């Protein structure tokens, strides 16, 4: 995803934490907030408790980014959201990551239409 689709600054992360709503499942927590903008923005956080090595944390982030890239046409454009991985997320493969993200994003109301989970 392009940099314009990412939330990078700490102040922007904190704004979504403070003023947004949260939804969670077993593997991910999503904080989301409506905004007036041409496209959605996403921040991804994977802590050291999730994966003890940088390789594992980066792999989880790659899985999340790829899943979001595939879901991009169905994500509400007026939303900023943060995806925070929980400890159990390190057990997921790419398909499991996408399935769990679809589930939690449906709960948050971020997805515009129904998507079949493969």
Curated annotation (Swiss-Prot):
Record keywords: Endonuclease, Hydrolase, Nuclease, RNA-binding, tRNA processing
SUPFAM superfamilies: Ribosomal protein S5 domain 2-like
Classification via Gene3D superfamilies: 3.30.230.10
One Pfam family per UniProt: Ribonuclease_P
Superkingdom assignment: Bacteria
Gene Ontology biological-process entries: tRNA 5'-leader removal
Catalytic function, reaction form: Endonucleolytic cleavage of RNA, removing 5'-extranucleotides from tRNA precursor
Molecular function terms from GO: 3'-tRNA processing endoribonuclease activity; ribonuclease P activity; tRNA binding
EC number annotated for this UniProt entry: 3.1.26.5
Leader sequence segment: none
The keyword NAD belongs to this UniProt entry's keyword annotation: no
Alphabetical list of HAMAP family matching this protein: RNase_P
Subunit structure: Consists of a catalytic RNA component (M1 or rnpB) and a protein subunit.
Function of the protein: RNaseP catalyzes the removal of the 5'-leader sequence from pre-tRNA to produce the mature 5'-terminus. It can also cleave other RNA substrates such as 4.5S RNA. The protein component plays an auxiliary but essential role in vivo by binding to the 5'-leader sequence and broadening the substrate specificity of the ribozyme.
Protein family: Belongs to the RnpA family.
Record's protein name: Ribonuclease P protein component
